[in-house]
Regions:
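Short, well-ordered beta-strand segments in beta-rich or mixed alpha/beta enzyme
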Residues: 3-10, 40-72
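A general secondary-structure junction signal
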Residues: 43, 98-100
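Intrinsically disordered, low-complexity segments enriched in polar/charged residues with Gly/Pro
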Residues: 15-16, 27-28, 43-45
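An amphipathic, aromatic/His-enriched active-site/gating alpha helix that lines ligand/cofactor pockets
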Residues: 25-37, 58-95, 104
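Short amphipathic alpha-helical segments, especially helix-boundary/capping motifs
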Residues: 1-4, 15
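Short amphipathic
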Residues: 6-8, 95-98
């Protein structure tokens, strides 16, 4: 069964450009991994100079997702990239969930 990684973020206006630059870099890497099906970024500006963002990445299977997760962690380490530190510095709030996808 397909696995869907769904991340939700609240991004301050002043952090938006840097956050998107880093997010798009991660997305470009994920697209190269075996088992990647599709991914999207959704964005909605709220009235408080913040942006609500959702990113999704769909994987063929649980195994493909797990392999991608490990590959992403290795790539972060290779680049010296720490997503948690970036989120703290940019004052981005986030939450992650992994869901099974099935048609309805």
């Amino acid at each position: 069964m397909q696995q869907v990684l769904i991340d939700t973020f609240i991004v301050p206006e002043e952090s938006r450009a840097e956050f998107l630059e880093n997010t798009r870099g991660v997305q470009e890497f994920l697209k190269t991994l075996p088992g990647f099906v599709e991914g999207y970024l959704y964005e909605k500006k709220d009235g408080a100079n913040r942006h609500n963002m959702i990113t999704t990445a769909v994987w063929e299977s649980e195994e493909a997702y797990e392999n991608a997760r490990k590959a992403a962690l290795a790539e972060y380490q290779r680049r010296g990239f720490n997503p948690q530190e970036l989120a703290r510095r940019l004052r981005v709030e986030g939450e992650r969930g992994v869901y099974e996808r099935s048609p309805y």
